[in-house]
Amino acid sequence: MTKVKNIYEFLNEWAPFSTAMSFDNAGLLAGNGEEEVQTVLLALDITPDVVREAASCGAQLIVSHHPVIFDPLKRLTPDSAPWLLARHAIAAICAHTNLDLAPGGVNTCLAARLGLANVRPLSIDPPSGLPEALCGELPAAMEPREFALHVKNALDCERVEFTKGSAPVRTVGLCSGAGAFCMPDPQTSGVQAFVTGEAKHHELLAAESIGLTLVVAGHYHTEAVVLPEVRERLSKAFPEVTFSIAAASRTPSHAV
């Protein structure tokens, strides 16, 4: 019989929790590793709606990307996700920055969804020695606006923001989520565009000033691409367990 700890160990082999960034809170964040598992729900975030969905389908475990406990808890109320996890005796494993960095993880899945070839490291996370950003080539060059539309369609976004770089886009860098800190200089990196989930105003100005096409596609959309990969890997490793992506796993924002 599969236990929570077996799924934790599998994820730890793929994306070691020891490689998570220092600010992170990844790992088994709720529940008992010895509990048996027949049904697992996958989600980007463990929201109250996700926990309620897990309870309704009889799941014993939720595997998420974002930690259900990140900032210090200041209150625990009946409508909060941690309370609901405890109430329904549902365990939570959260694979965050360790899954961003892992081969086959979030950034790899984002590169695949964008159709990039010759995918390789763009920059390295010093503590882990793993790539924090990747780059690769498009099949053919695109003008900046055309590339932004390509990203929008590939990630099924309602909208994207972008800066118009000074050159057609063939080589693309990327870092999922809040990854604008990895934004490269096109003159030294050979990258004409960079895709991420979030960027601050001054980062958009910086991209424009160096002639980089910066495409901001939304935190959720640049990271949710990993959920099918997690489901596929876990389903192959544990065929006796049912893995499904939560219907309640969605972006909280809307575009008008």
Q: Which functions belong to the PLM regions below?
A:
Residues M1-V256:
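Hydrophobic structural segments
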